C-alpha cells in the first residue's frame, strides 16, 4: 500500500473553496469543487504545488457542502449531485450519481512521461476514461468527419483552418470532460477507453461536469468559462462577402444593387488586400489606391442602413507600423505563415520573393495592446465588426524548434491551442473598454474552449464547395455547439468553388446548374445557423449572378433570405435565451429527444432553437453530385487537374418539384411550416416541394413569432407581429426586445413579453411586459394564428391579456 494522506485545505485568495488532496506515491491528486456536480481534478507526479491560472476557465472554486467518507482503500467525496471515489493506491477516480449509479470512471492511473520543453523539464501527460462500449459522445470542436457521435475518433486536436479541435466532450449520459491543456493534444478511443494525451504539461488537469443532460452540461461549461454576450441585432441579418471586393466602389455597387433589387441585407464584408501588397500585409490601414476614401465608403454603407465588417489577421508585413512596433519589443514569431510571397497578384506564390510576414505574440498583453492601438485606426472610421482570419494561426512547413519560442506564458508549444482565445479576447476586451455604445461582433476562423464569452462567431474555414462538405457542416456545427459555444456558421456555397468553373460548356460557375443547386441548398441550410453569410472564392456569390425574380434559383436564394428576416423576432429572442438561460441555437436532436435512438443518431437534422426542426436538403436532386474525383479536389485554390466535364448535363429544370424525406422525432406532433399540415412523431415523412421551398417543421407545443417583411433588421419596429401557436402540448415563449445594439441590456434596459399556451383550454396568455428600454414601442398589435388558419387580432399595451382560440 502506497503512502496515503488526506488534507482539507483552503486555497489562498478564494472564498473558502473546498479542496481535497490525496498523496499517491511520489505525486498527488487534488479535487476542487466549482459547483455541485462540477469539479476540477489535478494530478501531479510530485507533491510540488501546481499553480497555474487557467486561460479558459474564469470561474473561481466555491465552498460546497461535501460529505467525506474513508475506507481502507478509498476516499469518498459526495455533494448533492455526485459522488467521487478516489482510490488511495493509484489515484484513479470513479464518478457516480448521488444514488450511486456509476457515471464514468478513469481507465487507469495518470501517465507522466518526462520531456524537454524548450530547455525546461516537463511531462507528456495522459489520462484515460472508461466508457461503455456503445456510449455516444459529442463535441471535440469543428471536425469535418460527418459524424454525430465522436466515438472511434483518433486524432490530434488543435486549432486549424477547416477543423478546430476543442478539448472537450460530453456524453449522452449527461456528463462532460474538459481537458485543460493548451499544447497539441491527441484523443484516442480504444473501444472502451477514451484518452487525452498532451505533448507537454506540468499536471493532468481536467474538469468533470455533471449536468444530467446535454443542456445541463452546456450550462456547466458556461458557468466555468463565461456566458455568451448579446450580439447586435444586425448580426442575425444577411451578410454578403466574397474573396474579395477589389475596390471600395465595387463593394458599394453591390450594396446599391441589393437595395435596388429589394434583396434584404444588413452587412457588407471586405476581405483582405485593402492594405495593398503583401509587404504591407494587415497594415490596419487602407493603403490600396482602390480604397481612396474608406471613411466615405463606411459612411455610405451606413447611409444605406447596413453595417461593415473587415478582415484582419494575426500577422503583419515587414513594411507595416504594427510590425515595426512589435518587432522592436521582440513580440513577433519566426514561423512560416501566410502569405508566403510578397507578390500578391501572382499564383502560385513566388517563393523567391518571400513576404517576410510574421505572426504576433498574442500571449503578451503588451502585444495585444499594440494590436488594438493599430486596429483603432479602422475602428475610428466607424467599422462595425471584425473578421479575424487565420486565428489558429497559419503555420507552414513547421519544425519542432518553431514551438520552442517563449511567449511569456511558457513555450509556444505549451500554449499553442490558446492562440484563438488570446487574440480574439484581446480585441473584445479592448473594444469593450473603448465604448459601450455598440456591441462587439467578431467572426473568427478558429476557436479555443471558452471563447463564447468574447462575442465571436466561429466559421468552419475555407471548406471546398462539394455536397459532401455541405453535409459535413451540420454535424460539425452541432458538435461544436455541444462544446458550449453556440455561434457557428459556414461559407454559404463553400469557399473553394473553382472546380465548377469551365466544367460545364466552358462557362463560369455562376452559369453552371450544378453550382446553382449546391449554392441554393447551402443558402437554405444557412437560414438555420446563428450567422447567415455568403462568401467564397473563385465564383461571385451575389444573387444577381443567379438569375432574376421569377426564376427558380434566384427565387430560392431570395426566398431563403426573406424567410430569415421573417424569423428575426424568434432568432433574436432565442439569442437572449442563449445569453440569459445558457441555451443553444443549433440543437443536436440528442438534446431534445434523448430517448429516440433514431433521432439522436441523425447527422442531417437538428432543432434551431426550441421550436424549429430544420430538415435541410443536403443531396443533389437535379444535377450530378460529383464534380472532381482527383486528390486535388480538396486542395484549395483552383487547379487545372482533375475536373469532371459536365457537358452531358442538359435540360436541368429547377421549376419541377422534388421529393424530400424527413424524420420527425417521437414524442411530439409536428407541423409543416408552409401549409400547417400536422404529423405524428416517430416516422419518416415524404414531401414533394418546389425548389424554392425550405423544408422545416414546428414542434407541437410551440409559440413562434413572425416578423415583418423588411430590407434590413431594424427597418420596422416589432409593433405588428404574427404570433403562431402550434397546439399539441402546453407551450411558452418569451419575446425579447432591446435597442438592438449597445450594452444597455446589461443594466436591465430591455423588455420581455412572456407568452404561454394552455393546450387544454386552447388559450394563449400574453403576460405583463417586464422591463423597458429607450425607444421601446409600448403598444403592439398581435395577430394570433393557428396552423389551420384560424386567427384573432389583439391590441397589447403591456398588460396581461388572454386569447381563447
Residue ranges and their predicted role:
Residues 32-36, 50-60, 85-99, 773-790:
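Extended Gly/Ser/Thr-rich low-complexity repeat segments
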Residues 18, 24-39:
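N-terminal-proximal low-complexity accessory segments that begin disordered
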Residues 693-800:
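Accessory, solvent-exposed terminal regions and/or long lumenal/extracellular loops of proteins
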Residues 1-20:
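Bacterial Sec-dependent N-terminal signal peptides
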Residues 51-67, 639-647, 672-691, 790-805:
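Solvent-exposed beta-strand/loop surfaces of large extracellular or lumenal domains
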Residues 101-686, 690-692, 699:
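Catalytic-domain carbohydrate-binding cleft regions of carbohydrate-active enzymes
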Residues 32-77, 112-116:
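A low-complexity, Ser/Thr/Gly/Pro-enriched, surface-exposed linker/loop concept
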Residues 31, 41, 77-84, 613-616, ...:
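Short, well-ordered beta-strand segments enriched in hydrophobic/aromatic residues
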Amino acid at each position: 500500500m502506497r503512502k496515503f494522506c488526506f488534507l482539507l485545505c483552503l486555497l489562498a485568495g478564494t472564498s473558502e473553496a473546498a479542496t481535497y488532496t490525496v498523496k499517491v506515491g511520489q505525486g498527488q491528486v487534488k479535487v476542487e469543487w466549482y459547483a455541485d456536480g462540477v469539479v476540477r481534478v489535478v494530478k501531479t507526479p510530485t507533491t510540488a504545488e501546481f499553480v497555474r491560472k487557467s486561460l479558459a476557465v474564469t470561474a473561481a472554486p466555491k465552498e460546497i457542502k461535501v460529505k467525506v467518507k474513508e475506507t481502507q482503500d478509498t476516499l469518498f467525496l459526495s455533494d448533492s449531485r455526485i459522488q467521487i471515489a478516489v482510490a488511495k493506491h493509484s489515484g484513479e477516480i470513479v464518478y457516480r450519481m448521488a444514488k450511486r449509479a456509476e457515471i464514468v470512471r478513469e481507465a487507469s492511473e495518470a501517465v507522466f512521461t518526462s520531456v524537454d520543453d524548450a530547455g525546461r523539464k516537463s511531462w507528456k501527460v495522459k489520462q484515460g476514461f472508461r466508457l461503455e462500449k456503445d456510449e455516444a459522445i459529442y463535441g471535440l470542436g469543428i471536425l469535418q468527419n460527418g459524424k454525430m457521435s465522436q466515438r472511434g475518433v483518433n486524432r490530434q486536436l488543435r486549432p486549424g483552418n477547416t477543423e478546430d479541435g476543442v478539448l472537450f466532450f460530453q456524453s449522452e449520459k449527461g456528463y462532460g470532460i474538459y481537458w485543460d491543456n493548451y499544447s497539441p493534444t491527441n484523443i484516442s478511443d480504444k473501444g472502451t477507453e477514451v484518452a487525452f494525451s498532451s505533448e507537454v504539461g506540468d499536471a493532468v488537469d481536467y474538469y468533470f461536469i455533471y449536468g444530467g443532460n446535454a443542456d445541463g452540461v452546456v450550462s456547466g461549461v458556461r458557468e466555468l468559462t463565461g456566458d455568451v454576450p448579446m450580439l447586435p441585432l444586425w448580426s442575425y441579418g444577411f451578410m454578403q462577402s466574397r474573396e474579395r471586393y477589389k475596390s471600395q466602389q465595387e463593394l458599394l455597387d453591390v450594396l446599391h444593387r441589393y437595395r435596388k433589387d429589394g434583396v434584404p441585407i444588413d452587412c457588407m464584408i471586405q476581405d483582405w488586400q485593402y492594405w495593398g501588397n503583401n509587404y504591407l500585409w494587415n497594415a490596419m490601414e487602407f493603403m490600396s489606391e482602390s480604397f481612396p476614401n474608406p471613411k466615405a465608403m463606411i459612411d455610405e454603407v451606413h447611409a444605406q442602413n447596413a453595417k461593415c465588417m473587415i478582415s484582419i489577421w494575426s500577422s503583419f508585413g515587414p513594411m507595416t507600423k504594427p510590425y515595426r512596433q512589435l518587432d522592436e519589443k521582440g513580440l513577433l514569431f519566426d514561423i512560416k505563415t501566410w502569405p508566403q510571397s510578397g507578390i500578391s497578384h501572382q499564383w502560385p506564390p513566388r517563393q523567391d520573393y518571400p513576404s517576410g510576414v510574421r505572426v504576433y505574440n498574442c500571449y503578451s498583453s503588451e502585444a495585444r495592446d499594440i494590436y488594438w492601438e493599430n486596429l483603432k485606426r479602422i475602428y475610428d472610421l466607424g467599422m462595425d465588426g471584425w473578421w479575424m482570419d487565420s486565428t489558429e494561426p497559419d503555420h507552414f512547413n513547421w519544425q519542432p524548434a518553431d514551438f520552442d519560442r517563449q511567449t511569456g506564458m511558457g513555450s509556444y508549444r505549451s500554449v499553442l491551442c490558446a492562440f484563438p482565445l488570446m487574440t480574439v479576447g484581446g480585441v473584445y476586451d479592448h473594444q469593450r473598454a473603448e465604448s459601450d455604445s455598440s456591441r462587439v461582433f467578431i467572426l473568427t476562423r478558429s476557436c479555443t474552449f471558452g471563447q463564447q464569452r468574447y462575442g465571436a462567431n466561429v466559421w468552419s474555414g475555407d471548406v471546398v464547395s462539394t455536397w459532401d462538405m455541405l453535409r459535413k457542416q451540420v454535424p460539425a456545427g452541432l458538435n461544436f455547439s455541444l462544446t458550449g459555444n453556440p455561434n457557428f456558421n459556414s461559407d454559404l456555397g463553400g469557399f473553394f468553388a473553382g472546380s465548377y468553373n469551365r466544367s460545364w460548356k466552358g462557362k463560369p460557375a455562376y452559369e453552371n446548374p450544378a453550382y446553382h443547386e449546391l449554392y441554393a441548398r447551402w443558402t437554405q441550410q444557412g437560414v438555420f445557423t446563428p450567422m447567415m453569410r455568403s462568401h467564397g472564392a473563385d465564383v461571385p456569390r451575389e444573387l444577381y449572378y443567379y438569375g432574376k425574380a421569377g426564376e427558380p434559383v434566384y427565387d430560392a436564394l431570395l426566398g431563403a433570405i426573406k424567410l430569415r428576416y421573417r424569423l428575426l423576432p424568434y432568432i433574436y429572442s432565442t439569442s437572449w435565451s442563449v445569453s440569459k438561460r445558457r441555451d443553444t441555437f443549433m440543437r443536436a436532436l440528442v438534446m431534445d429527444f434523448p430517448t429516440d435512438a433514431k433521432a439522436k443518431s441523425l447527422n442531417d437534422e437538428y432543432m434551431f432553437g426550441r421550436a424549429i426542426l430544420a430538415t435541410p436538403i443536403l443531396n443533389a436532386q437535379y444535377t450530378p453530385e460529383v464534380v472532381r474525383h482527383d486528390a486535388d479536389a480538396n486542395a484549395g485554390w483552383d487547379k487545372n487537374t482533375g475536373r469532371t466535364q459536365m457537358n452531358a448535363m442538359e435540360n436541368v429544370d429547377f421549376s419541377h418539384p422534388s421529393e424530400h424525406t424527413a424524420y420527425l422525432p417521437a414524442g411530439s406532433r409536428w407541423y409543416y411550416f408552409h401549409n400547417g399540415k400536422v404529423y405524428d412523431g416517430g416516422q419518416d415523412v415524404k414531401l414533394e416541394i418546389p425548389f424554392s421551398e425550405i423544408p422545416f417543421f414546428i414542434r407541437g407545443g410551440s409559440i413562434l413569432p413572425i416578423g415583418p417583411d423588411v430590407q434590413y433588421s431594424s427597418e420596422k419596429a416589432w409593433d405588428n407581429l404574427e404570433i403562431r401557436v402550434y397546439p399539441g402540448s402546453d407551450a411558452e415563449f418569451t419575446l425579447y426586445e432591446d435597442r438592438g445594439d449597445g450594452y444597455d441590456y446589461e443594466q436591465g434596459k430591455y423588455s420581455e413579453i412572456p407568452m404561454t399556451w394552455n393546450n387544454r383550454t386552447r388559450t394563449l396568455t400574453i403576460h405583463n411586459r417586464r422591463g423597458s428600454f429607450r425607444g421601446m414601442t409600448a403598444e403592439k398589435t398581435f395577430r394570433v394564428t393557428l396552423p389551420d388558419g384560424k386567427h384573432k387580432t389583439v391590441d397589447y399595451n403591456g398588460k396581461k391579456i388572454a386569447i381563447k382560440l
